[in-house]
Amino acid sequence: MSSELLEELHWDDGFAIPVANEENKMLEDQLSKLQEERASLQDQLRDYEDRINAMTSHFKNVKQEFSFTQSLCKAREHEIESEEHFKIIAERELGRIKDEIQRLENEMTSIREKKSDKENNIFKTTQKLDGLKCQINWDQQALEAWLEESAHKDSDALTLQKYAQQDDNKIRALTLQLERLTLECNQRRKVLDNELTETLSAQLELDKAAQDFRKIHNERQELIKQWENTIEQMRKRDRDIDNGALALARIKQELREKENLVKEKIKFLESEIGNNTEYEKRISVADRKLLKCRTEYQHHETNRNQLKDELDSLKATVNRSSSDLEALRKNISKIKKDIQEETARLQKIKNHNQSVKKKLKQITEKTMSVEEKATNLEDMLREEEKSVKEVEVQLNIVKDVLFKKVQELQTEAMKEKAVVSEIEGTRSSLKHLNHQLHKLDFETLKQQEIMYSQDFYIQQVERRMSRLKGEINSEEKQALETKIVELKKILEEKKSTFDLLESQIKKLHNDLYFIKKSNSKNCDEKQFLMTKVNELNLFNDRSEKELNKTKALKQDLMIEDNLLKLEVKRTREMLHSKAEEVLSLEKRKQQLHTAMEERMEEIKVHKTMLASQIRYIDQERQNLSAEFHERLSKIDKLKNRYEILTVVMLPPEGEEEKTQAYYVIKAAQEKEELQREGDSLDAKINKAEKEIYALENTLQVLRSCNNNYKQSFQKITPSSDEYELKIQLEEQKRAIDEKYRYKQRQIRELQEDIQSMENTLEVIEHLTNNVKEKLSEKQAYSSQLNRETEEQRPKLERVTKQCAKLTKEIRLLKDTKDETLEEQDIKLREVKHFHKIIDEMLAEVTEENAEIHIILQTYFQQNGLELPTAGTKGSRQSSRSPSQTSLLSARSTTSVASQTSIKVLELNFPASSSVTGNISRPASATTIPSNGKNKKGSK
């Protein structure tokens, strides 16, 4: 057939059969390469998307597990706290009940004793009454006789009457006392009954509360068990994920081993790879450029990370400096306020001092007695002492407040330093982990690129092998021509069988019509079921929304319950703190009382010492005055003696007489000496008197201090103004403390939220940057591929047009409108190539995933087919001979394809597997579908 066609075209025998020229072959090779690169890039993109999804899901699972463990820990802590709290309450309640029982027992014993005493008294009084009644019920006749006998004794009768009245009064008093005691006994019994009923009701309430607590405790235990089960399940899932990762690593290792085997086999094909040296050189140049770009990228990335770290450190320093500046501003404003207050106080003190000075001047100017001056001075001193005390009290208060604030500031500074150090540590660890993650991503990218390059190289080698095996020599051409002659004879024989097959095809068409009818019915049923499924999905969505609403309501109720518990706990803590404060105040009161008593004893001792000193000074003063008088008397005596001596010691005659001036000077000198001694003694006396006066003043000051000290320990009455001021200040303090705690709690919560949000933001920014970079690279690469495909598209259209033109010319030459044998042979080869690609894809997928291998094997066995493997792929390539590519095989396969229908295999994978969809495969490798062009397009 082909020889006749070539003869009609006047084709010379020396030329080969027309095939595609070198340019078209190169274009086809480039197109196939681009398509393969596009497919590999799409697979790589899907792989990246799967990895991102896996990482996000793993991150969500980790987050959820962390939140679950945190909530479980909090629940455990709350449970322990509540159990301890209830234990303390139960112990207190037990102690209180024991005290109450002891008190009631004591009251019962006292009541029993009182009851026995009262019964004894009643018994005695009844005996007395009986005796009195017996005495009264004497014989009236004897009494009248006794009265007649004692009528003359009026005084005795009067006394008897008086005693009788006294006895009546005593009887009435005893009866009244008896009635009163019975009433009191009844009242006590009523009170006892009331107390018993109250205790019983309280006991019942306590039992009910205990039952409720046990119920709540059991519910909490069940909830915690459920949480623990969920956490255990999540851990199991994590273990399964880890096992899957290990299996994936193992499979990758096996893949690497197989790749090594392939490399060893490829060494045998080095003789056929001479044509690839130029491409390899280009690839090496491109690799060098890529390595340079990667090194530059790593350098830029390290610079960027360093700059980012510096920016973070600068931000931290700026934040720290701003916080320090704000703290300094606040301290400066506080110091300014304190300075203003102190200046105002100083101005007040100065004004007060000026007024005191004015008063002092007025007092000094006025002619007052010494006593009035002393009283004024004492009043002034008292006022000054009061003002000084007030200032000292205020100063002590300010000092205490300042000390507390300084301590709080120190603690807050320490906390801030600790938090800053923790933040810096976490940041450094995060940077280190990010750096490691970048390194690992870079290494994985390198390995994937190496794998993709090796796969591409293997595919090229396989294509070349197939081309080498599919080429036809001149000797084979002659053999084929002889076979064509033989096959023509066979064709005539087959035409008879063709008629039979046409009748069978008609029958099959009828069967197909009935099958289509049943298929349309099945489609209607499928649509009905799909509507039902959609309705069920809507119902599920609605129910899930309602479930979420109920969960939100439940969470709100739990939050309210926790808030109420916190409020109760806070009030209890406040109560305990107040009780502790009361105890500390009572201890302080006792300490102050003991200190006051010790101070009083010291003051008494000091008083006795001062009195003894005063007595001693008085004695010294008296001694000095006695010495002074003695010396005056001595002076008089000396004067007399002087006069006597002057008379006696007159100079004898003949000697010079000492003048009077000499003796006057001598006497004046002696007088001056005596005057000096007297002045010194007067100074000592004055000094002693001043010291006594000062000691008296100090004694008065001590007395006033002691009086004020006593008054400070007096209890404040509720009617006084100070009591109301104290209550107001306590309320203000309580409100301020509550506000302070609330603000602190808010600040802590906000800081925690900000920290968590910053961490999540950093992680998300890092992930988004990585994804954006990868996406930009892929987009650039895909745009490049699209440009290349757009450039190749007109060439492809031109080639398809040329092929269509040639097919039309060939059909016109053969005078046929149907497909020729050559076209069928070309389609057969295309289909075989398509089947080969599908087999390779299935083999690769089954090698990568064992689960998919099992599922595919079951589906293929159900449809009576064999699953393609790596071995069958190699055998299929090796078993392909030139004889199978001959026109004889083409004719036989076309005839069989026209008689048989295509067998479709539907694969429905479960949701857990990563592969979903339908895979259609022909019954055998030799079947040719009727729509070959569509197959080619789908490829």
From Swiss-Prot:
**Annotated stretches, region: Disordered:** 776-796, 867-892, 912-939
Q: Where is the composition biased (Polar residues)?
A: 912-932
A family per Pfam: CCDC39
Q: Could you tell me which InterPro entries the record lists for this protein?
A: CCDC39 (IPR033290)
The protein's location, in the record's own words, is: Cytoplasm, Cytoskeleton, Cilium axoneme
Principal place of residence: cytoplasm
Q: Which superkingdom heads the taxonomic lineage of this protein's source?
A: Eukaryota
Q: Which residues form a coiled coil?
A: 16-124, 164-425, 457-512, 540-825
Low complexity bias: where? 875-889
Q: Which residues carry this modification: Phosphoserine?
A: 898
Cellular component terms per the entry's GO annotation: axoneme; extracellular region
Residue stretches of biased makeup (Basic and acidic residues):
787-796
Gene Ontology process terms (BP): cilium-dependent cell motility; epithelial cilium movement involved in determination of left/right asymmetry; inner dynein arm assembly
Keywords (alphabetical) are: Cell projection, Ciliopathy, Cilium, Coiled coil, Cytoplasm, Cytoskeleton, Phosphoprotein, Primary ciliary dyskinesia
Family label = Belongs to the CCDC39 family.
Q: Which disease is it linked to?
A: Defects in CCDC39 are a cause of a primary ciliary dyskinesia (PCD). PCD is characterized by recurrent respiratory infections and situs inversus. A spermogram showed oligoasthenospermia: the midpiece is narrowed in around one-third of sperm cells and the flagellum is shortened in around one-fifth.
Which function does this protein serve? Required for assembly of dynein regulatory complex (DRC) and inner dynein arm (IDA) complexes, which are responsible for ciliary beat regulation, thereby playing a central role in motility in cilia and flagella. Probably acts together with CCDC40 to form a molecular ruler that determines the 96 nanometer (nm) repeat length and arrangements of components in cilia and flagella. Not required for outer dynein arm complexes assembly.
Its name, as the record gives it, is: Coiled-coil domain-containing protein 39
